[in-house]
Each structure stands twice: as structure tokens, then as C-alpha cells.
């Protein structure tokens, strides 16, 4: 009777485990065979001729995505080329160069910090930093997500840019100044956090270049496609 009860109980347990997708393996506890292994997909690499690269001079207050449930301005309002996606981020409240492509591997190499694509920003800050302040940024500053890598930083005269809409909010009794900051990292809102860390909040941020590509000659809100020769040079730069 005891043996029969044990067999019945064991049978019920196996039936329960089978229904749940679990079978015991030798010497180990039950394993769940319903779990599927999802291999990490490699970014899609296209040939030179198949690749499209778009340079876009992003206006202020535009999201770097093509849809938005809240009805805010997106890339769809400016770019009519299908199946291209942004290489890296550019915050809604930032302006300037955004690169888009249909080549997944190119997108990955432009955005991933390990490929060290240098990005140049013109940054209007509140106040006038001294050389000792800039030296902190060059060396690296401690942010919540770690110490930043060394940056190239210098004071510049006010650049000849388009008017921002809406204009920045300036305090009349506090002067502003412009910095040129070059970094190869891509942390969230990194430049803004860097300038705030040394006591000079960012008022306006414009990305002017990524690697060899820049917004020179590109009006704010407009885009252009790279030529085949330009794409070839870009492939060589990122070692594709």
C-alpha cells in the first residue's frame, strides 16, 4: 500500500512537471525545456552600394525617433527616407548633427564608445569658466555613472548659428560664454552633466560634428544623403 501510494504521488509529480515544461535530468533538478535560447543578433551589415547615410541638422525640441504617441515633433516631420535609424542619441533639447543609416553595423560603430568616434559640441553655458575649470573637464570629472574620460575643451567666441526657437532663458545679470567640447563617449546627457559639475549650467547645446562628418552648409531642420564616395570614406574611418 505504501509503495503504491509513493508511485501514485511520484506519477502525479512527474505529470505536473511535464505540464509545466520541466523534466528531471540525471543527477540534477528538473529543467524547464520551454525556455528558449535567444542568441544575440549581430547588427545587419549592408554593402557599400546598399548603404544609405543621412546627415540631419536637428532643431531644438525634436525627438530622435519617428513616432510619438504624445504628438511631439519627431524625425518623421523632417526626413522622408524610409528604413534609416539614428546612430546614437541627441537629446530633445539639443540641436545639430544627427546621423541616420540603414546599415546596422555602421550604426553600431558610430554609436558605440569603444570605436571612439569623436563628437564635437558647441556649448553655451551660464557664466565664464576659468582655465582651472576647463582643466577639470579635460582631465575627467566624477559623475553618478563614473568618471568621464579626458575631453578636449576650449573657450570659443560666439558661433554664427541659427536662432533657436524658443530662445534660451538668460539671466540679465549673469554673462554667458561658449565652449567647444570634444568627447568620444556617449553617456546620457553627458555634456550637460559635465558643465553642471564644474558650476556652469548648459543653456544651449549644438553638436557640430561626428568624426569627419559635420553640419557645415546644412540649414537647421534640413538633411542630405551622403554620396557614395563619402560613404566609402566613412566605412574606412570606422574600419568596415
UniProtKB/Swiss-Prot annotation:
It comes from the Bacteria. The keyword Acyltransferase does not apply. One of its GO terms (molecular function) is RNA binding. InterPro entries: PsdUridine_s_RsuA/RluB/E/F_cat, PsdUridine_synth_cat_dom_sf, PsdUridine_synth_RsuA/RluA, PsdUridine_synth_RsuA/RluB/E/F, PsdUridine_synth_RsuA/RluB_CS, RsuA_PseudoU_synthase, TruA/RsuA/RluB/E/F_N. Pfam families: PseudoU_synth_2. Its EC number is 5.4.99.20. The active site is at residue 91. GO terms for biological process: pseudouridine synthesis; rRNA processing. It catalyses: uridine(2457) in 23S rRNA = pseudouridine(2457) in 23S rRNA. It is an enzyme of class 5 (isomerase). SUPFAM superfamilies: Pseudouridine synthase. Keywords: Isomerase, rRNA processing. NCBIfam families: pseudouridine synthase. Responsible for synthesis of pseudouridine from uracil-2457 in 23S ribosomal RNA. Belongs to the pseudouridine synthase RsuA family. This is Ribosomal large subunit pseudouridine synthase E. It comes from Haemophilus influenzae (strain ATCC 51907 / DSM 11121 / KW20 / Rd). The gene is rluE.
